[in-house]
Structures are given as structure tokens and as C-alpha cells.
């Protein structure tokens, strides 16, 4: 009988604590006042233009079902998971940033697509640099262009051609 009373008291205590907690309804979203700050460093697929830190939900809806699937893994840079969406020629990475799922990475996967800036895997570095404005920072074989929240990374092979093109969060690029 004493065990039963102890269990009931424990359950009642938990219920009381839950009832007293503040769970305020969400009347606003953190995307209402969002303004992109990636300048000319954005990506586009069809009529859908998007960039780093854009709210992911509307972009993913506009892009449609990822033709090459999705993947998720534990995140090293953010709390929670990394979500990857694989489309023809490019990949989109999404993370939860301050309660909003945002685009945190865009990677050109192969030479079947071209960025809005005119960049394409396999093109000569000199040709790519002629298409981009602003200064860059070279770290080994990677050339980094930064505007606002975005860093555009161009990896170059031994033959002087682009081997990788990636848009990433500038704050994470240390």
C-alpha cells in the first residue's frame, strides 16, 4: 500500500510540474523578417533561387522531391542533425538554426550543372575568377570568396580546373 501511495504521489508531482510549465504558443516565426545577405553568391535551379541561411521549407518545396534521395546524420557544426537532399547535379544541406530549418550548404555535385555565376566543375580557375567579383582568400588549393553570410569555395586540381564548388556558412569557415 505504501508503494502505491508513493507511486501516485510521484505521478501527481510530475503532472503538477508539467501543468505549471510555460508553453507559450508560437504566434510568429523567425522567418518573417528574414532578408538574404548572400549578395551574388546564391544558387538557382530552374526558377528557384536560394542561398545560405534561407529558410529551407519553401526552397525544398519549390525544388520538389529530391531525385537522388535524402540522408541525415548527426551534426558536428549544429545541434541535432544534418539533412542532405540530393538533386540532379547538386546537393542541399539543411540544419536547425535557432529553431528554423535553414540551408547551410549547397554543393555542385558534377559537371552537368552551372551556377548562376557561370561556374562549372571542370572549367579553368582563371575563367572562374574572371566571372567573380571581389577578393578571395587562397588556402592550399581552395579559393574562397565571401559575401555576407556565404563563403563560396572553389577547389582546384593539379591541372588548374575546378574540382569542387561549394556554398557554405561564412561564420563556420574558420
Model-based region annotation:
Residues 35, 45, 56-98, 120, ...:
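A cross-family detector of function-defining hotspots
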Residues 6, 22-63:
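N-terminal, intrinsically disordered, polar/charged segments of Gram-positive cell-envelope systems
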Residues 24, 172-174:
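Short acidic DE-rich linear segments
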Amino acid at each position: 500500500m505504501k508503494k502505491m501511495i508513493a507511486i501516485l504521489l510521484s505521478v501527481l508531482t510530475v503532472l503538477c510540474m508539467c501543468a505549471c510549465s510555460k508553453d507559450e504558443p508560437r504566434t510568429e516565426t523567425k522567418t518573417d523578417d528574414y532578408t538574404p545577405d548572400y549578395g551574388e553568391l546564391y544558387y538557382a535551379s530552374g526558377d528557384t533561387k536560394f542561398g545560405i541561411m534561407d529558410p529551407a521549407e519553401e526552397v525544398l518545396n519549390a525544388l520538389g522531391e529530391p531525385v537522388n534521395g535524402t540522408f541525415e546524420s548527426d551534426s558536428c557544426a549544429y545541434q541535432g542533425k544534418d539533412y542532405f537532399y540530393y538533386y540532379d547535379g547538386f546537393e542541399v544541406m539543411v540544419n536547425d538554426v535557432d529553431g528554423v530549418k535553414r540551408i547551410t550548404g549547397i554543393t555542385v555535385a558534377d559537371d552537368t550543372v552551372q551556377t548562376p555565376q557561370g561556374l562549372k566543375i571542370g572549367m579553368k580557375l582563371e575563367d572562374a575568377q574572371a566571372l567573380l567579383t571581389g577578393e578571395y582568400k587562397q588556402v592550399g588549393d581552395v579559393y574562397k570568396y565571401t559575401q555576407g553570410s556565404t563563403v563560396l569555395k572553389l577547389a582546384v586540381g593539379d591541372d588548374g580546373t575546378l574540382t569542387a564548388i561549394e556554398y557554405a556558412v561564412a561564420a563556420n569557415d574558420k
